[in-house]
């Protein structure tokens, strides 16, 4: 049973780390002079944490089968408390992720729109003195 508790604690720690990274990503997206390298570094760190989370979740499932206990762990108060913390953290992560997606879409939509306007401005169609079209 202690193995299961340790695994759930590790999962909780990883989720808190993901929360910090998502908050940092949000902060970087809101700054106007953030380089793409900083955002890519955060994405790499998130990938590493997600891989660890997947491995720990598989371990948790195996331990649950072994001990014949499943979420929300009503029979064990300690596990139940940790599980509630994990659920709350997951809800926070979901909100942060949605917020980051919205910010990212707005930021890159504006950049794309600027590039489209810039290219259309440079490639404007005009008439020359002879009345012929020029591009």
Swiss-Prot record:
SUPFAM superfamilies linked: FlgN-like
Alphabetical GO biological process terms: bacterial-type flagellum assembly
Keywords: Bacterial flagellum biogenesis, Cytoplasm
Top-level taxonomic group: Bacteria
One term under GO cellular component: cytoplasm
UniProt-listed InterPro entries: FlgN-like, FlgN-like_sf
Localization: Cytoplasm
Cross-referenced Pfam families: FlgN (PF05130)
Family: Belongs to the FlgN family.
Function: Required for the efficient initiation of filament assembly.
Protein name as catalogued: Putative flagella synthesis protein FlgN
Gene: flgN
